[in-house]
Regions:
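Amphipathic helix-loop-helix modules that constitute alpha-helical solenoid scaffolds
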Residues: 53, 57-112, 121-293
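Structural motif corresponding to the intra-repeat A-B loop/turn of tetratricopeptide repeats
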Residues: 216, 279-282, 315-316, 351, ...
């Protein structure tokens, strides 16, 4: 980006570098520093494209000077190429949501559709947002360079959000045949660990790493032997990854001792309550509701309110949960969100309002684009249909 000043050209150069890597590395082996190899090839491609497009001699000299400056930039603050690029992309001249969306799309490999779902907007709206951001960068000539160590904290909030949304997209894939995208989960965990090594005294950095560890500890328990989705209540907790839980509990304890917790520390604290319960029916739902109350004050969002309503349904009963969920039905961001319909379905089922529960499960199945989730929701509909069938004696069950 520093060389081309154009996101589309930069993306073309990166794709060309990866294509050359596939051809070269298969014959000559992977170089000692793959990231530097790719950067060099992409940079050469950018300079070559500039020459082919008849860039003026003076501009070309500036281009080459920029490339030389890139070579001389200090890298000690952020040693990992991926993390360095994310910090670079999160430029404070752009709105935080735009920084995050660009990083997810351009650096993390998410499709525009996946980025849109992460932000609860339509794909067309996200595509337009990304296009406007690229134009702003080009017109305003926003300088993209690796930030110095002193600048890291001005960008850390956006970087944390990038890593968090990368994890959530991987943890439950918004589209596709698999419940999770393990490569995205592992990439986000690597990035969270590197952030913690870089800023070990930052409570929110610590909280994010704890959140990922505690949530990912359930990875192997979320799908049954036949590939079916297993809800939290149905999981075998003895199969949860104990080392990840132990590490996460230590980290969240450390984060909470640092003073007023931020959103990632609070989400990690909620995950810690789940991880500490030996069985589903021993979950401290009142504590979870209290933590969600703090989270809403710190980071208000419809999704947080939805999760609080679910917790409330177990702390105070399905009636209370359903009332809270119905209050969210007018939220525009949740109009196509399958988990709102699924949460309503579960409350209605517990209230034995079978027909309404069936309709809500059907709505959730229609909205989700994850086939594992859809199969689970359709199985719930089949169970309800069986329960609602008229018995031989003519009485309704």
């Amino acid at each position: 980006m520093r060389i081309t000043r154009d996101f589309d050209v930069a993306e073309e150069c990166v794709q060309d570098a990866f294509a050359k890597a596939l051809a070269s590395w298969s014959q000559q082996g992977i170089p000692a520093n793959p990231g530097a190899w790719l950067t060099t090839v992409a940079r050469r491609r950018a300079i070559d494209l500039g020459r082919r497009r008849d860039v003026a001699i003076r501009s070309q000299r500036l281009l080459i000077t920029d490339a030389e400056m890139f070579d001389r930039e200090p890298t000690a603050a952020i040693e990992d190429d991926r993390l360095r690029l994310i910090f670079t992309c999160c430029h404070p001249s752009l709105a935080t949501d735009t920084q995050v969306a660009l990083a997810l799309r351009m650096l993390c490999g998410l499709s525009t559709a996946e980025v849109a779902k992460a932000f609860l907007v339509k794909e067309s709206a996200m595509a337009a947002r990304l296009t406007r951001a690229k134009k702003k960068i080009a017109i305003a000539r926003i300088p993209y360079r690796v930030p110095e160590r002193a600048e890291l904290r001005t960008r850390i909030d956006a970087v944390l959000l990038v890593v968090h949304l990368l994890f959530t997209t991987g943890h439950t894939s918004p589209v596709g045949e698999e419940l999770s995208q393990v490569d995205l989960v592992e990439r986000s965990l690597d990035l969270a660990r590197m952030l913690h090594s870089l800023l070990p005294d930052d409570g929110e950095v610590t909280g994010l790493l704890a959140l990922i560890l505690l949530t990912d500890s359930r990875r192997g328990s979320r799908v049954g032997t036949e590939g079916e989705f297993l809800a939290l209540a149905d999981q075998d907790r003895s199969t949860w990854h104990r080392d990840s839980i132990d590490e996460g509990l230590v980290l969240i304890g450390d984060a909470l001792r640092r003073g007023r917790p931020g959103p990632f520390s609070l989400m990690a604290a909620i995950a810690a309550v789940h991880s500490s319960a030996p069985h589903w029916d021993e979950t401290d739902w009142s504590e979870i509701v209290g933590l969600y109350d703090l989270l809403i004050d710190t980071w208000p969002s419809p999704v947080v309110a939805l999760n609080r309503a679910v917790a409330l349904s177990f702390a105070e009963g399905p009636d209370a949960g359903l009332r809270a969920l119905d209050e969210l039905s007018a939220e525009p961001q949740l109009s196509a969100y399958p988990y709102l319909a699924a949460a309503r379905a579960n409350c209605l089922l517990r209230l034995e309002r079978m027909s309404e529960a069936r309709d809500a499960f059907a709505e959730a199945a229609m909205l989700t684009e994850n086939n594992v989730e859809r199969s689970y929701l359709l199985s719930r509909i089949e169970e309800l249909d069986e329960r609602m069938r008229v018995p031989h004696d003519g009485r309704h069950q």
